[in-house]
Amino acid sequence: MSNTVYNEGYSGNKNLFFRKGINDTIFTQKRKFIDLGFCSGANLLGHNTDIQKKILKKYIKNNISNFSSPNIYAEELAKIIIKTLPNFSKVIFCNSGSEANIKALRICRAITKKTKVVNVVGSWHGSVDQFLFKTSKKLKVTELSNGLTPDLKKNIIFIPYNDIKSSRKILDKNRKKIACLFIEPIQGCLPNKNSKNYLKFLELYCKKYNIFLVFDEMITGVRTNLRSAQDFFKIKTDISTFGKAFGNGMPIGFIAISSKIKNLIKKKRLHIYFGGTFSGNSLTSFFAKEYLIYLIKNKKKIFNYLNKISSYFEKEINNYCQKNFIPARVYRFFSMIRLIYTSKKINNRSARDFLESLKYKEIKNFRNYILDKNIYYPNNGIIFFSYSSSLKNINYIIKTFKSGLKKFFI
């Protein structure tokens, strides 16, 4: 019998429909799994933790209603965010990363009066019509979805990640038509620490030619030791979008804009619509505010542990693969992790996709093996740990990964 829900992911096995989660474990009707996804990285503390329960009880006890009207909790949350992200002066709330990117793009086009947007190959910006395209190795653009209007394809330009020479050539050819450049500074498809020079190039190029630089930091915001990737790399963007771990499970997205953008909107007297019934709603705002206060107070303890277990996993798997000549390596940026199925050094998704396509059967069998051992390995391949990930379970994950790699890749 087919499933009633038509969203992505619901066409598969109903035995993998989850009903609850506790700390680092998630449950279906019949089985339990150690989680490697944590709601695509959003659940930084884990599932159904004591602090989450405490915050929700406080919300109920104080008789707070879920206002869609302006409320004090959204303002209080915004002030904490600005202290956490010092490069920005204003925050625009919404409910998801996709929505944040839609509105960030709207801001750029409203100010510049230009329509073309640059995306970096390998960056994912959610279910945004303008970004639902992919490229071939030669950067030929094709649609990822039906229902996209022809002008969208005309308005998207792709540049290769971590390739300054090729990116400069494409940008030089189109720079007068470009409103903005979107990029995930650390891509989920390849959490590469070695992108600073490329990101610095983009920052300087965009500044020189008046192209707005937009960082999509859905996966890096908060997880970068309660900072952002741009703060880590010392890059200043015009606009950045955030979500996921800023809500620890609550649906949240927001756009952070610089003083430059704020002043341009005011100077040009632009009316840019940002509304939405639940944008900045009091439930999400109150929860996120209390959660961020908790993170700030316990920053050292939480992030030291996250980095410790993430580094431990990386070293154990990589040392095992090197010692046994297994063509696989772990790539990591703080607690964002991906197992890449090649031992060759790669710098972008195009190289990764080509090399992994040669091992499609082995990868599929390996992932099914991990699932059979009661470890939930997310379909998108991005591994996130949480503060609730126990060392006992991390050791079990490492042991299982090693046995699976030996079984299918030697």
Q: What are these regions, as identified by a protein language model?
A:
Residues 1-410:
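Conserved N-terminal phosphate-binding loop of PLP-dependent enzymes in the Aspartate aminotransferase
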